[in-house]
C-alpha cells in the first residue's frame, strides 16, 4: 500500500518527507520554545504564536501553505496549535525533517525572533519577523506589526521580490560587527566569547553606563 504524503495529526496534516513539499509554495514557521525571552518579551502580543499562524492563513494566497514545525523540546500537545481551528492551509512538519532544509526550500520564513529567520536571510529568502531582534532591519526582512503590514509584506514578496545579494548579506553582517560588543548575558555562550568573566563584566557594565549617560538617566536620578 502506498504511503500517504500527509497523515492526520492533532487536527492538522503532517508531512513526513521534505520532497512531499517540492511542488508547494509555503511559509515556514518553526514554533518557539516557551516560556523564553525570545517570545516574551521580545514577541509582544505574538507570544501567542497562534496569532501569527492565523494571520498568515488569512493573508496568504489560496495556493500557499503554512508549514509549522514544533520545537523539539516542546513535547506533547502544542499550546499554539491547540488554540487553532483545523485548516487545510496548515501543515505540520515531522521533526525528522531538518529545519534548515525547510528554510532553504521555503518561499518565505515567518518567526517571532527565531534563528530560522536569520538563516532565511543568509539564504536569500524573504522573512516575516513578528518580534524585535537584531536582524529585523536586514534586507528583505519584513517587520510585521499587524495584519495590514503582513499583507503589504506578502504582496511585496509575490509582486516584486528580488533576492538579497551576497554583497548585501556581507554588508549587514559587517554592520552588526561594527555595532556589537564581545560579551555574553547567558552562560551557555560563555565558551564562544573567548574573554574572562571579569572582562565580560567590565564590557556589560560599560555598555549599561553608556546607555544611562546617553539618556541622562544618571543625572535625572540625582
Describe each region flagged by the PLM.
Residues 1-37:
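A nucleotide-sugar donor-handling region in carbohydrate enzymes
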Residues 21, 85, 103-104:
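A short, aliphatic-rich alpha-helical micro-motif
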Residues 25-26, 65, 107-108:
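Structural motif
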Residues 32-36, 72-75, 116-117, 134-135:
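Short, solvent-exposed loop/turn segments at secondary-structure junctions
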Residues 36-50:
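Mid-to-C-terminal functional-domain signal that highlights helix-capping/loop sites
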Residues 53-93:
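Catalytic donor nucleotide-activated moiety binding site of glycosyltransferases and closely related
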Residues 94-142:
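A donor-sugar binding/catalytic signature common to diverse glycosyltransferases
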Residues 140-222:
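Leloir-type glycosyltransferase catalytic cores
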